[in-house]
C-alpha cells in the first residue's frame, strides 16, 4: 500500500513538473517574434544620421513620440504608418 502511495505522489509531481516546463517554454515562444523583429530592424549607432525630437519609421516609440504621419504601434512599440481603419 505504501508503494502505491509513493508511486502516485511521484506521478503527480512529474505531471506538475511537466506542466511548469511546458508553460515556461510556451511563454518564451510568445516573446520570440518580438525579439526577432527587433533584432532585424535594430539600427546600429554607426548608421544613425542624427538625433530627432521624434521617432521615424520602425523606430522605438517608448520614450519618444512618433514623427508626423506615423503612429506608435500598441503591439510592437514601433512607429508605423497608420492603418486605414485607425484614421
From Swiss-Prot:
Regarding tissue, the record states: Expressed by the venom gland.
Sorted alphabetically, which keywords does the UniProt record give? Disulfide bond, Ion channel impairing toxin, Knottin, Secreted, Signal, Toxin
Q: What is this protein called?
A: U3-theraphotoxin-Hhn1a 9
Which GO cellular component terms, listed alphabetically, does the Swiss-Prot or TrEMBL entry include?
Answer: extracellular region
Span of the secretion signal? 1-24
Q: What is known of its domains?
A: The presence of a 'disulfide through disulfide knot' structurally defines this protein as a knottin.
Localization (cell): Secreted
Disulfide bridge map: 54-67, 61-72, 66-79
The entry assigns this protein to a family as follows: Belongs to the neurotoxin 10 (Hwtx-1) family. 51 (Hntx-8) subfamily. Hntx-8 sub-subfamily.
Pro-peptide positions on chain = 25-52
Pfam families associated with the record: Toxin_12 (PF07740)
State the organism named in the record.
Cyriopagopus hainanus (Chinese bird spider)
Role played: Ion channel inhibitor.
